[in-house]
Amino acid sequence: MMKGSRFKLNQNHAPIHEALETFRRMRVVPFDVPGHKRGRGNPELTEFLGQKCVGVDVNSMKPLDNLCHPVSVIREAEELAADAFGAAHAFLMVGGTTSSVQTMVLTACKRGDEIILPRNVHRSVLNALVLCGAIPVYVNPEVDQRLGISLGMKREQVEKAIKEHPKAVAVLVNNPTYYGICSDLRAIVKMAHDAGMLCLADEAHGTHFYFGGGLPVSAMAAGADMAAVSMHKSGGSLTQSSLLLTGPDVHAGYVRQIINLTQTTSGSYLLMSSLDISRRNLAQRGRQIFHQVADMAEYAREEINAIGGYYAFGKELVNGDSVFDFDITKLSVHTLDIGLAGIEVYDILRDEYDIQIEFGDIGNILAYLSIGDRAQEVERLVSALAEIRRRFRTDGSGLLSQEYIDPQVVTSPQDAFYADKCSLPLRETEGKVCSEFVMCYPPGIPILAPGERITAEILDYIEYAKAKGCNMTGPEDPDILRLNVLTGRE
C-alpha cells in the first residue's frame, strides 16, 4: 500500500476495467450522454468498433468515478500507476502526452519565468510557453556531424545555463530524444535541485525505461519532479492516452488544478481503461516484454548494418556526456549513404512494401519497436531495406544532412504569437521574426518557433524538406508558401 493510500494496491487489478465490466452487466437504461446510447443510435459506428467497445463508451457517473476529481476507481488506478512507475503520484491523461507535457510546464512556470531546455523539444513544450508566457533559455545541443541529428544536453552546458539564469524555475530534459539519445539525467536533476529548480522530463518515448533492465534510467528513478510518459507509444495503451508522473515534492492538488484548466470534462473511459489494463500488463510482464523488444532491435541493427550503405546506430554513440546513454529499442537508421533521404526511404517502404515506419527525416528513418512487434515483421523490414538499396541506390549528390539549426531567439513565444503580424512570401521573410511554428511531423520538433529569426539556412531547409515530401505543419498557410512575421521588428 502506498503511503497515504486508502486502497490496498494490487498490481493484478485493473479497477477501471473491472468497474466497466460490472457496469456492463447491470444493463442500466441510459438517459445521459453519449447520445449513441450504447451504440443503438449509430449502428454503423457499432458495426465498425464493435458492441463491446461502444457499450463502455460512457459518461462519468458515481460507480465509474470522475476524471476531474477522482475519488474511487480512477483514483485507485492512478495510485496503482504511481506504484508501478515508482512515482509519488500519477495522473491519467486523455489528451495525449501533449497534455502531460503542457501540464508540467504550466505547473512550473508563470508569465515571465525562465525555463532551461534544449531546442530540440516537441512542439507541445513550446506551445505551453505560448500559453503561459514563460521565457525559454535554450541549451543548444551538439550535433552528430555524420548523422545530422541533435544529441543530448552536456552537463557543462546545463551548469552554465543555470549559473547565467539563477532565477529560472525549471530545467526540462528529453528522456530520450526521438532517436534514442539520453542526457545525464541524474546529474541534471542534481544540478537543478541544488539551484532550487524543478526538473521536468519529457518521456514520451521512454515508457519502457520503467520496466527494462539494461535500459537508460527513468525520470522517477533519477529523482525528476515530473515526467510525461506516453503509454500508447511503447506501453500498449490506446492512442491519445498518457500518464503524468510526479515526485514527492510536487503538490498533486495543484497539478490537478492545472490539468483541469485544459483537459476535457468528458474523459474517455476507453482511453482510461486502456491505461489501466496496460499498466497491469507492464507491472506483470513488462521486464520480460521489453527484454524481448531490446533483443529484436539489436538483431535488426546487426542485420541492417550487414546490408551495407545503411547505418543503424546504437550504443557505440555513447560518450558519457552529450550521449550519456542510448535506448537500444530505438531502431534508427541513417540512409544518406545509399543516396536517399530518410523521408524517401519512408515513402518507398510504405508505397512499395506496405511497411509503415514511424518517420523519415532528412537523413534518417525510425522504426518503432514495442510490445506488439514480432520477429517475422522485423525480418520483413530488413529484407525490404536490402531490396531498396539494390533497386533505388543513387550517388546522393546534393543531399542535405543537417537536422538541427541553432535558433536566433528575438522575443518570447507568447509575445511573438500574439503580436501584430503580416504574411509574406516564404523567400521574402529572411531576416524577419517568425510569429508561428514550422515543423516536419513527425517528429514534431519545430524548425521555427514564434519569436525566432528566419535565416536563409532555415528557408533552404524548409524548401528542401518540402521537396523531399516531408509532412510539414504549423503555419496558417497549409502549403507553406507564405509565413506570418512580426510587423515593425527586424
List PLM regions with ranges.
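Structural signal for conserved beta-strand scaffold positions within catalytic alpha/beta enzyme cores
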Residues: 92, 138-140, 229, 359, ...
